[in-house]
């Protein structure tokens, strides 16, 4: 029953997420008609989705709380501990909110997520404008399930910097390997300088980030109601 319940709920949230993307991005004003659609979907799933009311409890709330936040930010590069603390006031209230067609938790978390997306664009644009300090040895833990959320926005920005530095280093190595292969084929081939490789690597990382957030923006602006 728990698996079935979880599946139903995830499907519900995917549908509601689709609708809410349009609601949150098209206008900052509350739209009563769109709110009615959200509430109708929630009510339908609760009344027609064969939920076991006994399982709509604090355990269920905690599961939804953890899974929803983890799905939005699996690499912990958007939310901080401050955000999670604010979200936590709803940790054991989601079951009651669903029964009452209340989307306060969803609106808070998803609205904050959209704000963080905007911040992320500023982060990578600023970080990738100039070369990294490659003489400085740094450590980054990419076990996202094990690491904790950043304590502050400053700490989060540093986490972004380390990730982008690592991506840039990987691309530099790829380009160095390509040059080495060309040199083996033709020893008259002139290998590119480190500064040239570094500049191209940062540009490639920037392009990857731009493409990623273009796709995210398209999702945010898509007219979900036309497919509802």
Where do the language-model regions lie?
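Flexible, low-complexity junctional segments that flank or bridge functional domains
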Residues: 2, 20-227
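Bacterial N-terminal signal peptides
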Residues: 9-18
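Bacterial N-terminal signal peptides that target proteins for export
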Residues: 1-9
